[in-house]
Amino acid sequence: MAIDFGALFGRKNPPMIGLDISSSGIKLVELVESGKNELRLECYASEPLPRGAVVDGNIENIDQVSDAIARAWKKSGTRAKLAAMGMPPASVITKKIILPSHLSEEGLELQVETEASQYIPFALDEVRLDFDVIGSVENSPDDMEVMLAATRKEKVEDRVAVAEAAGLKP
């Protein structure tokens, strides 16, 4: 069991904003903890994008998108620079897989990579891979369900580039 020493000594997580980049515009939110398991919307802003800046989830014009992010950030009034961004659903491959529950963390990572190579139509060095253990399998206590997610590295790198160009830390 991990101990959250920051919470133990009264330190909170650093403020973070969420960014949604779509073909029509940028949406920015900042949520803050307002109680146990409760969040409050602290800031929100949206900014339109010129036609063609983002097409089918692909960032086509980094300058236009980063400028819109910077305008939304300024308009929101937030001071947070740490940003979390999602990927467009069409750019992400997800697959629920079953793995043995006795695997170590390192063994789990290796097994996920092995399994991913069966489901991802790209070389693994071309993708960003992530996974999350969902829980144990109902009728098989020796197994666990794992959600696997993968997207092309270039898609992630484009989103990181626009956030950094806007002065944020993705």
Enumerate the language-model features and the residues they cover.
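Hydrophobic/aromatic-enriched cytosolic interaction surfaces used to assemble or bind macromolecules
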Residues: 1-170
